Amino acid sequence: MLTRKQRDLLEFIHKRMQRDGVPPSFDEMKEALDLRSKSGIHRLITALEERGFIRRLAHRARAIEIVKMPDAMTGGGFEPRVIDGDRGPAPANAMAVRAAPAREVPVMGQIAAGVPIEAISQVASHVAVPEQMLGAGGNHYALEVKGDSMIDAGINDGDIVVIEEGNTADNGDIVVALVEDHEATLKRLRRKGGMIALEAANPAYETRVFRDDQVKVQGKLVGLIRTY
């Protein structure tokens, strides 16, 4: 039996992962549940983990996987948004993931979630991505994340991010940004006037601000694949 707050938090995490492909940050959870501090979120997360509804991924800051949903909340079906690789036996109460149609997406190399690295434009391999994550239409590619600047957005070093190709993005979108035509980075984009801010999701990294003509959007985040 879950409390109302526990159910509300679980539902919020589930909806955000369905929409964005990554878990919300603790600040976003706190705001969504109208709590005064993140300590309340920590207590709710711990309670959900103890009851087997979620799992916090070891050695990955604030990375959360939904293991199951309450029966009353699964009328439309439920599948975890984090795609698991080889990791040994699953917990006894873990739900089996149903096979879903998938599409091969090219992995274009590595992208920095930290200090920008040289832009990558060659296909390194391919990865199978559920069509549900890709949606209808559009071109997609994938990149391996290097660095920890986006950990508070649930994006960790070694994750594979799935990107919808395009040169436009809304304020607050997580994008692949090409800086001065030679460095690529994964950051949250903010526009103000003729300037663009590339925000990290880790307080250890500073926000970098550029003129509009120094940054080109190469695509926006639509999902995430994690193996561990």
Swiss-Prot record:
UniProt GO MF annotations: DNA binding; serine-type endopeptidase activity
Residues annotated as catalytic: 149 (for autocatalytic cleavage activity), 187 (for autocatalytic cleavage activity)
Entry superkingdom: Bacteria
DNA-binding region: 26-46
InterPro entries: LexA, LexA-like, LexA/Signal_pep-like_sf, LexA_DNA-bd_dom, LexA_repressor, Peptidase_S24_LexA, Peptidase_S24_S26A/B/C, WH-like_DNA-bd_sf
Sites annotated Cleavage: 113-114
EC number(s) on file: 3.4.21.88
Enzyme class: hydrolase
GO annotation, biological process: DNA repair; DNA replication; negative regulation of DNA-templated transcription; proteolysis; SOS response
Gene3D superfamilies listed in its UniProt record: Umud Fragment, subunit A, Winged helix-like DNA-binding domain superfamily/Winged helix DNA-binding domain
Keywords: Autocatalytic cleavage, DNA damage, DNA repair, DNA replication, DNA-binding, Hydrolase, Repressor, SOS response, Transcription, Transcription regulation
ATP-binding keyword on record: no
Reaction(s) this enzyme catalyzes, per UniProt: Hydrolysis of Ala-|-Gly bond in repressor LexA
Record NCBIfam families: lexA
Assigned protein family: Belongs to the peptidase S24 family.
Subunit annotation: Homodimer.
Cited PANTHER family: LEXA REPRESSOR, LEXA REPRESSOR-RELATED
Function of the molecule: Represses a number of genes involved in the response to DNA damage (SOS response), including recA and lexA. In the presence of single-stranded DNA, RecA interacts with LexA causing an autocatalytic cleavage which disrupts the DNA-binding part of LexA, leading to derepression of the SOS regulon and eventually DNA repair.
Protein name: LexA repressor
Organism, scientific name: Jannaschia sp. (strain CCS1)
